[in-house]
From Swiss-Prot:
This is Adenine phosphoribosyltransferase. One of its GO terms (biological process) is purine ribonucleoside salvage. Pathway: Purine metabolism; AMP biosynthesis via salvage pathway; AMP from adenine: step 1/1. One of its GO terms (cellular component) is cytosol. The modification N-acetylserine is found at S2. Catalyzes a salvage reaction resulting in the formation of AMP, that is energically less costly than de novo synthesis. It is an enzyme of class 2 (transferase). The keyword Acetylation applies. PROSITE patterns: PUR_PYR_PR_TRANSFER (PS00103). Belongs to the purine/pyrimidine phosphoribosyltransferase family.
Amino acid sequence: MSEPELKLVARRIRSFPDFPIPGVLFRDISPLLKDPDSFRASIRLLASHLKSTHSGKIDYIAGLDSRGFLFGPSLAQELGVGCVLIRKQGKLPGPTVSASYSLEYGKAELEIQKDALEPGQRVVIVDDLLATGGTMFAACDLLHQLRAEVVECVSLVELTSLKGRERLGPIPFFSLLQYD
């Protein structure tokens, strides 16, 4: 992994205490999105990891609603694969599959269209941040319901003190930046 690129990405993440509720330290990626060099570096770093780990054996990137949508299509394009969307409840037309999950600060439900993937297709799930792992775990559940293979979950930021990685069990997880 390129240390200069990683530092470029890290400098563009800022913190807001007590947002959206007291006791939560929000990691804001907005400065990263404003800076094309930093954003490109984040995509290159994630793609480099996935290329070296999976040797081109990825069929799709699944972007999580909503900030995973910012990285999913660019990462998919960099890897030369398709991108599918995992949305919050009620946002997708047609038949869907759903799974409930807990956030760091609430509860919600995710959905994916039933025809989004074929059984056996190899998928990487991407989001901006891993906290408790609830969203990623629900996304894995959705893809397993479609009989797709989740080969890895990735995010820009990981909040290690919340142990979200452990919630994913045997599914590999990778993050560019780790914060306590």
